[in-house]
Amino acid sequence: MPTDNDLKTSIVELLRDLDALLVAHFYQKDEIVELAHYTGDSLELAKIASQSDKNLIVFCGVHFMGESVKALAFNKQVIMPKLSCCSMARMIDSHYYDRSVHLLKEYGVKEFYPITYINSNAEVKAKVAKDDGVVCTSRNASKIFNHALKQNKKIFFLPDKCLGENLALENGLKSAILGINSPEEIKNADVVCYNGFCSVHQLFKLEDIEFYRQKYPDILIAVHPECEPSVVSNADFSGSTSQIIEFVEKLSPHQKVAIGTESHLVNRLKAKRNHQNTFILSSTLAFCPTMNETTLKDLFEVLKAYKNHRAYNAIELKDEVARLAKLALTKMMELS
């Protein structure tokens, strides 16, 4: 059995031989992040990979991320060591999007402006594009939301109800959740949210904030906007993974901070600063199971197979789906 160091050496050699670009999301395992040419959040990696001069992109993340790169750069080869699917992205597909639109119309919502969080598959992004909507990420969500408000239509935000509710609260707007609230509440809401969520960020609770504030009165709380509204509204800072990193790295090493996002990222931040002053905002192990499926062995095997002309786990999209998804993604990039 090859050791981890053997695998790392082989992976570096294969990447060089294949002239490939390796990108990894912040939530990937440390040994994967260590080898990546670039690490980042969804928006950063989509831009970097699609604009790279490399023809072969190796994406360590979850499936919708690979799809986004393929849609933006259709002629590139995009492969993934694991075709892991984000649990939130699994909560909606094109069929459920159509059903949601049907419900909105049944409830008397004649016009709406759809925003899909990037955590959705390419077919959903294509549906949103056909309805003249746009994609957003947690980093640019406020800018995209402000653009949507100028359309003077009810906003349909999918699939993450928490991010949608948090954006509504940020703008003093009334929100309702499709499938939870009554037809009358849906009709009267400014923002209608699909009933999806992140299984990791649901672990962070208001009680966790209260615990840390009681124990350390001067502590700062930084969370991801996929957390529940009660958590976000009581935090000192809310932002994307990149924004959380930027926020924490600017703090004095003496400043205590509790962070509400995936544990691998928090542990890396702890290693960079005074670990005794850096905490994860949960007593539960908050790691993303699908983000952590990718191993060094998976990465080595997918590269070796590609070199031997036995490629697998290649991202494929229908031409029309890719074209429409690209429209929604490009619109997002132009607005942000």
From Swiss-Prot:
InterPro entries: NadA, NadA_sf, Quinolinate_synth_A_type3. It is found in: Cytoplasm. Its EC number is 2.5.1.72. Pfam families: NadA. Pathway: Cofactor biosynthesis; NAD(+) biosynthesis; quinolinate from iminoaspartate: step 1/1. Its cofactor is [4Fe-4S] cluster. One of its GO terms (cellular component) is cytosol. GO terms for molecular function: 4 iron, 4 sulfur cluster binding; metal ion binding; quinolinate synthetase A activity. Its main location: cytoplasm. It comes from the Bacteria. Binds 1 [4Fe-4S] cluster per subunit. [4Fe-4S] cluster binds at residues 86, 198, 288. Catalyzes the condensation of iminoaspartate with dihydroxyacetone phosphate to form quinolinate. This is Quinolinate synthase.
